[in-house]
């Protein structure tokens, strides 16, 4: 979530999620315990879960967790417990969760929110607040101490979300995929393109690199277009390596996705990357999303870096200039 710190107030301005049935298809009552790094998006996560239909409680004392869960009766719960919480202990929280998971009527999951040290420091600088574990010391000291303290919880979490590169909309989309209450047990797939120069999406479950395909960037007529435009799509689709690659990709996914679903996974992110995130990856991601829909999956599609401003293009490599002079028709 670059650009602004995560707070309940900033999350309130995002599009609301869709609340639905109280229980998922298996009939168990959902309980989501939200923890993680201070500044990593805990408040935003609780607000998003509340919009999905959960009753949200923040900064609950650990000693009250079990009592609250059973006093809530039929309601799905989202409970924030983190290092600010009075009597907080990672080991004690894990013991409480194990005890709750022993109840057959509950589906208890641990959600861990985090971000990189650089992003966390920037968020604290923007809010001018001290770190809760380093009130009279530099913020980096508090971040390092908290990350060490929370290692057991991160390792035990069913869902880990790194918000470093995510917008609030992205976080809400991921939370909706993992924790929706519509009773639909099927696997939802989100396909996104991205630029390697801006980093691999941290939320991706599967990543595929299409930088081996011929790059439309070197054709001046195609450079300002995107992989959603027909001329670029035709250019990439004509690459002799594309048909075999796409066939192998779908052959891999065809048996893999049902296995994910059988293991209880409800949300899967597939990321397709190229250098600039505008041509090859966009076309391939769009093509893959269409194939997945044809297979009956519920599919979301995004293109992370499509509208990102890029630096001025570098000169074409010498071999590309020679080839262009000799066979200009191949690069129109």
Curated annotation (Swiss-Prot):
Superkingdom as given in the UniProt entry: Bacteria
Q: Which SUPFAM superfamilies match?
A: P-loop containing nucleoside triphosphate hydrolases
Compositionally biased spans, kind Low complexity: 10-22
Positions of the UniProt region annotated as Disordered? 1-27, 302-332
Which residues participate in GTP binding?
Answer: 82-85
Which InterPro entries does its entry note? P-loop_NTPase (IPR027417), RapZ-like (IPR005337), RapZ-like_N (IPR053930), RapZ_C (IPR053931)
Q: Does the keyword Transmembrane apply?
A: no
Arranged from A to Z, the UniProt key words for this protein are:
ATP-binding, GTP-binding, Nucleotide-binding
> Basic and acidic residues bias located where?
302-312, 322-332
**GO MF entries:** ATP binding; GTP binding
Q: Which Pfam families match?
A: PapZ_C, RapZ-like_N
Which positions in this protein are listed as binding ATP?
Answer: 36-43
HAMAP family for this protein: RapZ_like
What the entry lists under PANTHER family is as follows: RNASE ADAPTER PROTEIN RAPZ (PTHR30448:SF0)
The UniProt function text for this chain reads: Displays ATPase and GTPase activities.
Question: What's the family?
Answer: Belongs to the RapZ-like family.
Q: Under what name is this protein listed?
A: Nucleotide-binding protein RC1_2868
- What organism, scientifically named, is this protein from? Rhodospirillum centenum (strain ATCC 51521 / SW)
């Amino acid at each position: 979530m670059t650009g602004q710190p995560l707070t309940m107030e900033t999350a309130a301005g995002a599009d609301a999620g869709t609340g639905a049935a109280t229980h998922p298809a298996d009939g168990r009552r959902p309980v989501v315990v939200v923890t993680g790094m201070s500044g990593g998006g805990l408040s935003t996560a609780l607000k998003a879960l509340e919009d999905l239909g959960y009753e949200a409680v923040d900064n609950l004392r650990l000693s009250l967790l079990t009592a609250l869960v059973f006093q809530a009766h039929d309601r799905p719960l989202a409970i924030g417990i983190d290092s600010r919480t009075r009597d907080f202990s990672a080991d004690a929280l894990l013991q409480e969760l194990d005890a709750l998971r022993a109840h057959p009527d509950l589906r208890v999951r641990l959600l861990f929110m985090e971000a990189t040290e650089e992003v966390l420091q920037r968020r604290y600088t923007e809010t001018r607040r001290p770190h809760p574990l380093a009130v009279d010391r530099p913020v980096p000291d508090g971040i390092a101490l908290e990350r060490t303290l929370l290692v057991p919880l991160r390792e035990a979490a069913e869902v880990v979300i790194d918000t470093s590169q995510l917008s609030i909309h992205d976080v809400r989309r991921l939370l909706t995929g993992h924790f929706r209450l519509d009773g639909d047990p099927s696997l939802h797939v989100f396909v996104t393109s991205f630029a390697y120069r801006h980093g691999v999406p941290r939320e991706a479950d599967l990543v595929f690199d299409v930088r081996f395909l011929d790059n439309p960037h070197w054709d001046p007529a195609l450079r300002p277009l995107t992989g959603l435009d027909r001329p670029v799509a035709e250019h990439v689709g004509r690459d002799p390596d594309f048909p075999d690659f796409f066939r192998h990709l779908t052959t891999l996914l065809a048996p893999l996705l049902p296995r994910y679903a059988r293991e209880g996974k409800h949300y899967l992110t597939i990321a397709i990357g190229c250098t600039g995130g505008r041509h090859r990856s966009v076309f391939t991601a769009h093509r893959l999303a269409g194939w997945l829909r044809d297979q009956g999956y519920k599919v979301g599609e995004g293109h992370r870096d499509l509208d990102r401003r890029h630096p001025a293009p570098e000169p074409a490599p010498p071999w590309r200039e020679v080839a262009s002079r000799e066979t200009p028709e191949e690069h129109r």
